[in-house]
């Protein structure tokens, strides 16, 4: 998206989040098993049809709340922090639930590095901290963190489409993806079939 956020402020807030919030997958299953998750709004789909409401962790993160509620001009639904450890892969998959057909997924990279690749629809992207990205999670997508030592942390939020958010998408640079045979080989591991969680 043609907007950015203050990544240093976000990192400072998240660093102060009590450690008790971390250490689980936040109810996420399947291809998401490698990542830790802290839900800020709503619950993982695998936990059932639970209400989309603020969770306790969000009360510790006023700047992230501002990003969710004021910076993106649309109604927020589920939001989470997703920590992908070094050397991990989120296998390419398609999010199929009806919920995903009604929402737009936005990524806020908090920490990342040059060895993290987001795959989507046959192209690979590097999402840098402070940038804000839209991801078509109804298409094949996955993540490779090729550095065994460094993790990647994103805030991932789903929003209901609004005219203002659609206008931001229209102004976005859509030519940033590239083919990368090495990344795709590691993501797919010789398989061509996508997972459907």
Identify the role of each PLM range:
Residues 81-99:
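Conserved short histidine dyad/triad with adjacent acidic residue
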Residues 109-128:
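A short beta-strand-loop-beta hairpin characteristic of the jelly-roll/cupin
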Residues 160-197:
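Long hydrophobic alpha-helical segments typical of transmembrane helices together
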Residues 92-93, 116-118, 135-136, 140-148, ...:
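Short beta-strand His + acidic residue motifs that chelate non-heme Fe in jelly-roll/DSBH
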Residues 76-79, 103-107, 115, 140, ...:
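Extracellular structured ligand-interaction cores
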Residues 126-138:
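Short secondary-structure subsegments characteristic of cysteine-rich extracellular domains
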Residues 103-109, 132-134, 148-167:
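A short hydrophobic beta-strand segment most commonly corresponding to one strand
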Residues 1-72:
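Non-heme Fe(II)/2-oxoglutarate
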């Amino acid at each position: 998206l043609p907007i950015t956020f203050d990544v240093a402020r976000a990192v400072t807030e998240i660093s102060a989040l009590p450690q008790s919030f971390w250490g689980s997958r936040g109810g996420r299953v399947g291809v998401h098993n490698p990542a830790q998750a802290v839900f800020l709004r709503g619950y993982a789909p695998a936990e059932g049809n639970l209400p989309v409401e603020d969770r306790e962790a969000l009360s510790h993160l006023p700047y992230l709340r501002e990003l969710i509620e004021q910076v993106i001009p649309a109604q927020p639904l589920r939001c989470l922090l997703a920590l992908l450890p070094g050397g991990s892969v989120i296998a390419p998959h398609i999010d199929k639930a009806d919920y995903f057909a009604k929402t737009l997924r936005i990524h806020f990279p908090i920490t990342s590095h040059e060895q993290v690749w987001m795959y989507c629809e046959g192209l690979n992207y590097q999402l840098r901290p402070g940038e804000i990205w839209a991801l078509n999670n109804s298409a094949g997508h996955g993540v490779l963190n090729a550095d065994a030592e460094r993790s990647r942390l994103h805030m991932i939020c789903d929003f209901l489409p609004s005219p203002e958010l659609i206008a931001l998408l229209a102004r976005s640079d859509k030519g940033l993806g590239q083919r990368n045979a090495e990344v795709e080989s590691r993501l797919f591991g010789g398989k061509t079939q996508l997972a459907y969680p």
